[in-house]
């Protein structure tokens, strides 16, 4: 497979070792784009219910490099992240991570926290260096092949159980490589966001971190709506698009009537990372 730097790659890796006594596919999402957010110059697509609906199906229920649809996947258990700092600037990386995680927890209303012991975690997040990251990605994500990482900047993956519930995720960011290409923040934001259950890149989602042509590196208002939608209790893990459609439409109608769509821009710009970075 020939990779282009400006595109993402989604690969399903078969025959993985079992987790919780079961073997499930691991989805790998190399982050290959840099993303900054400017509402004034952006189409207000998140206000259009039909646009949001189509974007949701494409981001949550599709695989970029696989045929057909996939069932809905998300976390049901609390997300517990253990961060392994193997390079300098630990304080900076920790702060960037914690600020974005706080925002994700607020947007999704799903419990997400940083833990201090690896044994307590179901997400392993490694900050490393370029010379080590291929080997560490292979270990953290249990990869049999790492060829697809040669043109990637950073990577993440998750596993689901037979019901579609995400039970494990790994993230590996080679800091020197990401910084050299101006994509450290983009790696942090996109990788953890995608392993919440929105794995696919899509031209139908704009502005969005899931769209290669969006110049933003933080969550857009559309991303906020997509995350909220995914973690609505009415949408169950394992749902197909056919089963999800009437529920998605009902929720989006409610969002429009109660101001959720209209408030998405404000909620996106209230992210702690916006305050830190100075957007």
Question: How would you label these PLM feature ranges?
Answer:
Residues 148-183, 199-279:
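Metalloprotease/metallohydrolase-associated module, dominated by Zn2+-dependent proteases
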Residues 1-16:
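N-terminal secretory signal peptides that target proteins for export/translocation
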Residues 80-84, 171-173:
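Short, aliphatic-rich beta-strand segments
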Residues 37-80, 87-89, 108, 153-161, ...:
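Disordered inhibitory propeptide/activation segment of secreted metzincin zinc metalloprotease zymogens
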Residues 23-34:
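Bacterial N-terminal signal peptides
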